[in-house]
Regions:
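Short, hinge-like loop/turn segments at secondary-structure boundaries
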Residues: 33-35, 100-104
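Active-site region of PLP-dependent enzymes
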Residues: 91-97, 104-167
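Residue-level detector of solvent-exposed, low-hydrophobicity positions
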Residues: 2-8, 14-16, 41, 69-71, ...
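PLP-dependent aminotransferase-like
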Residues: 1-63, 67-79, 83-88, 95
Length: 167
C-alpha cells in the first residue's frame, strides 16, 4: 500500500500488473503486454490510451528479499522510455546479478518502519547516484527551507521527513 500511496501523493494514478510466481515481483512480460495494449508513444513519451495521462515510471517492489527480474524490467523501461524506481524495503542486502537491489533504477527506496528488516521506528532512505536528484530530495524532505542563518524562507512546498535524533 505504501508504494501505491507514494504515487498518489504525487498526484499520479498507480496502475497494477501481475507478478511473477518465482520472485513475487512485477512480471516484465505482464508489464510489457499491459503497456503494448494500453499506451502509445508520442514524441518518445508514453501515454495511456484510456486516460490520456503520461506514464512516467515503474516501481517494482522486491518482496521478502527476492529481487524482481530487473534485467527484464530494465528492458521494458528502456523500450517504453520509463524511469525505473525500486522499492527495495524488503530486500535490503539482497543481490541481483552482483549488484544490490535498490541501485538499478534512478531511485531506490528503503523504509525503516517498525516492521522492516532494519528499523529505527520510522523514517527511510532514498538511494540514487544522481547528485541533482539527491539535492532536490534533501531539499524537499527538510521542509524546502533555503539555508540561511536566521531567516525561514521556503521556496516550495516541502515535507518534514527528517529522522529524529532518537532514531
Amino acid at each position: 500500500v505504501a508504494t501505491a500511496n507514494a504515487v498518489s501523493y504525487c498526484g499520479a494514478k498507480p496502475n497494477f500488473v501481475d507478478i511473477e510466481e518465482s520472485s513475487l515481483g512485477m512480471d516484465p512480460e505482464a508489464l510489457r503486454n499491459y503497456l503494448k495494449n494500453n499506451t502509445e508513444q508520442r514524441s518518445g513519451i508514453c501515454f495511456n490510451h484510456n486516460t490520456g495521462c503520461q506514464v512516467r515510471a515503474m516501481i517494482p517492489v522486491h518482496i521478502f528479499g527476492h529481487p524482481c527480474d530487473l534485467e527484464g524490467l530494465s528492458a521494458v523501461a528502456k523500450d517504453f522510455n520509463l524511469t525505473l524506481i525500486e522499492d527495495a524495503t524488503e530486500s535490503l542486502g539482497s543481490i541481483y546479478q552482483g549488484q544490490h537491489t535498490g541501485t538499478f533504477g534512478l531511485i531506490g527506496t528503503l523504509s525503516f518502519n517498525g516492521n522492516k528488516t532494519i528499523t529505527t521506528g520510522g523514517g527511510g532512505a532514498i538511494l540514487t547516484d544522481d547528485s541533482e536528484l539527491a539535492k532536490k530530495a534533501k531539499h524537499l524532505t527538510t521542509t524546502a527551507k533555503i539555508p540561511h542563518r536566521w531567516k525561514y524562507v521556503h521556496d516550495e512546498v516541502g515535507f518534514n521527513y527528517r529522522m529524529p535524533n532518537l532514531n
